[in-house]
Regions:
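Basic, helix-initiating cap at the start of DNA-binding domains
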Residues: 1-53, 70-73
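Amphipathic alpha-helical interaction segments
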Residues: 28, 49, 70, 102-110, ...
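Short hydrophobic/aromatic patch on the recognition helix
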Residues: 55-65
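Amphipathic alpha-helical segments used for helix-helix packing
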Residues: 72, 109-133
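Hydrophobic alpha-helical connector segments
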Residues: 74, 88-117, 167
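Short, basic, alpha-helical segments at the C-terminal edge of helix-turn-helix-like DNA-binding modules
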Residues: 77-84
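Hydrophobic/aromatic-rich alpha-helical bundle segments in the mid-to-C-terminal region
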Residues: 122-127, 132-136, 140-143, 151-200
C-alpha cells in the first residue's frame, strides 16, 4: 500500500508539473504573438514565427491553438470576455434595462467599435481557416444572444420573424472582410454602417 501511495504521489506531481509547463508554454506563445502583432501587425503573424519568438517547437503551437485562427482568438479572449460580460450584466442599452430592440442596436454598434479597433486581428481570426468565423465560441454566443433578444422584441411588437435566421443576417455585415471592403473600397463611414445595421431592425 505504501508503495502504491508513493507511486500515485509521483504520478500526481508529474501531472501537475506537466500542466504547469503547458500553462507556461501557452503564456509564452500568446505573449510572443502579442509582441509580433504590436511590432509588425497581423501580417507578421505565422505559426512558425510565433514558435521562433516564443522559443518553443512549432508543434507545440499547433497543439495548443490548432491553427492561426485559434491563436488570434486567444489574443482576443480578454476583450471578448469583457464584451460578453457587458452584454449580460453591463449598463443599458448594451446590458439589461433597455428594450430588446435598443439592446440589439447597441450590440451591433459595439461590434462596429470592435472592428474599428481590431480589424486586422479579427480578420486573421475569421479567415485563417474555413468557417473559422462561424465555428468559434464567440460567434455562437453572439448569435444566441441576438436570437433571445429578437424573440423578446418580436413578442413585444407582435411581429413574426425567424429569430435564428435574422440573428445570422444581422451578424453577416459584421464579418471583418465585408466590413473592411465597405470601409476601404466602398468608402462607407463607420457611422453609415451603424445606420444601415439599425435599418435592418425594421421588421422588429
Amino acid at each position: 500500500m505504501t508503495s502504491d501511495f508513493a507511486a500515485a504521489a509521483v504520478v500526481g506531481r508529474v501531472q501537475v508539473a506537466e500542466r504547469a509547463d503547458a500553462a507556461r508554454n501557452r503564456r509564452k506563445i500568446v505573449d510572443a504573438a502579442g509582441l509580433i502583432l504590436e511590432s509588425r501587425g497581423a501580417a507578421g503573424l505565422s505559426m512558425d514565427e510565433v514558435a521562433r519568438v516564443a522559443r518553443v517547437g512549432v508543434g507545440t503551437v499547433y497543439r495548443r491553438f490548432g491553427d492561426l485562427s485559434g491563436l488570434a482568438h486567444a489574443l482576443l479572449a480578454d476583450q471578448e470576455q469583457r464584451f460578453q460580460e457587458a452584454l449580460l450584466s453591463g449598463p443599458a442599452p448594451l446590458g439589461p434595462g433597455a428594450s430588446p430592440k435598443e439592446r440589439i442596436a447597441a450590440m451591433l454598434s459595439a461590434l462596429v467599435d470592435r472592428l474599428e479597433e481590431n480589424s486586422e486581428l479579427l480578420l486573421v481570426a475569421e479567415t485563417s481557416a474555413p468557417y473559422a468565423r462561424f465555428t468559434c465560441p464567440a460567434y455562437e454566443v453572439h448569435h444566441a444572444h441576438l436570437v433571445a433578444l429578437i424573440a423578446e422584441a418580436s413578442a413585444v411588437s407582435g411581429s413574426a420573424v425567424d429569430a435564428e435566421f435574422l440573428a445570422d443576417a444581422l451578424l453577416a455585415p459584421l464579418a471583418t472582410n465585408l466590413y473592411l471592403h465597405q470601409r476601404k473600397v466602398r468608402g462607407l463611414s463607420a457611422e453609415r454602417i451603424r445606420h444601415g445595421l439599425a435599418a435592418l431592425l425594421a421588421p422588429l
